[in-house]
Amino acid sequence: MKVTDVRLRKIQTDGRMKALVSITLDEAFVIHDLRVIEGNSGLFVAMPSKRTPDGEFRDIAHPINSDMRQEIQDAVMKVYDETDEVIPDKNATSDNEESDEA
């Protein structure tokens, strides 16, 4: 399985979220709501998640092996590094941000 497209929107918020991302796998399957997060060890890609009633975040979709996780990370960060435009986003909040996983 390969990442065949990355759509990324850098955003300016008060929180640690730096971009919202959608990826396409094998030109056949799209995953929305990935995020680029500024963690204590630098930027990382967070998978789409939802907050559970006890306040924890649980991934909705995620890779099941380290090779696929690295491919997603590399593809997203390549586009992130190539994207200059930062959009102020009034709708993006730190409410859906995870704790540092990196």
UniProtKB/Swiss-Prot annotation:
Family according to the record: Belongs to the SpoVG family.
Family matches, as PANTHER family: SEPTATION PROTEIN SPOVG-RELATED
Protein task: Could be involved in septation.
Organism: Staphylococcus epidermidis (strain ATCC 12228 / FDA PCI 1200)
Any Pfam family matching the protein: SpoVG
Record's keyword terms, sorted: Cell cycle, Cell division, Septation
Domain of life: Bacteria
Positions of region (Disordered): 83-102
Gene (UniProt): spoVG
GO terms classed as biological process: division septum assembly; sporulation resulting in formation of a cellular spore
Protein name: Putative septation protein SpoVG
UniProt keyword Cell division, yes or no: yes
